[in-house]
Swiss-Prot record:
Pfam families: CcmE (PF03100). Residues 30-155 are periplasmic. The gene is ccmE. This is Cytochrome c-type biogenesis protein CcmE. It comes from the Bacteria. The lineage of its organism: Bacteria, Pseudomonadati, Pseudomonadota, Gammaproteobacteria, Pseudomonadales. One of its GO terms (molecular function) is heme binding. Heme binds at residues 124, 128. It comes from Stutzerimonas stutzeri (strain A1501) (Pseudomonas stutzeri). The chain crosses the membrane at residues 9-29. Gene3D superfamilies: Nucleic acid-binding proteins (2.40.50.140). GO terms for biological process: cytochrome complex assembly. Heme chaperone required for the biogenesis of c-type cytochromes. Transiently binds heme delivered by CcmC and transfers the heme to apo-cytochromes in a process facilitated by CcmF and CcmH. SUPFAM superfamilies: Heme chaperone CcmE (SSF82093).
């Protein structure tokens, strides 16, 4: 092999190695930032991966919010109409958080099936609900199809 071909082969291999490393780094970064959405039914059935950051949403069950007196710890149950899961959170809840309200929590499921949230989001006005939560509630029959005006929740 003459020196020109050797040099060209070395350059092509170096470029391929660089592109391979860049793709591997990009995929690694994307995998760490993907937060898949799971319904309470899926989490209760064990479909959510333990220890991986996920999003879960539904309606906060009436009478399920338990606060501690000496810290910012709060535990509550979220339902999609079929199943309910417990979510624990350490921090100040959003102003719009209340029982019967749609929420999305970001966190990790522990070995007990409890979602340990590091972020809780409440819907920001009376007409908005995250699409995933809306679909899960419609599927379970807890929410009638939205046709303008106020959303109605089945009791």
């Amino acid at each position: 092999m003459n020196p020109v071909r050797k040099k060209r082969l070395f350059i092509v291999l170096a470029i391929l190695a660089g592109v391979g490393i860049a793709v591997a780094l990009a995929l690694s970064a994307l995998q760490q930032n993907i937060n898949l959405f799971y319904t309470p039914s899926q989490i209760a059935a064990g479909e959510a991966p333990e220890g991986t950051r996920i999003r879960a949403g539904g309606l906060v069950e009436e009478g399920s919010v338990k606060r501690t007196n000496d810290s910012l710890s709060v535990a509550f149950r979220v339902t999609d109409g079929a199943q309910a899961i417990t979510i624990t959170y350490q921090g100040i809840l959003p102003d719009l958080f209340r029982e019967g309200q749609g929420i999305v929590a970001l966190g990790r499921v522990n070995a007990d099936g409890v979602l340990v949230a590091d972020e809780v989001l409440a819907k920001h006005d009376e007409n908005y609900m995250p699409p995933e939560v809306t679909q899960a509630l419609e599927k379970s029959g807890m929410m009638k199809h939205y046709e303008g005006g106020k959303q109605e929740y089945a009791k």
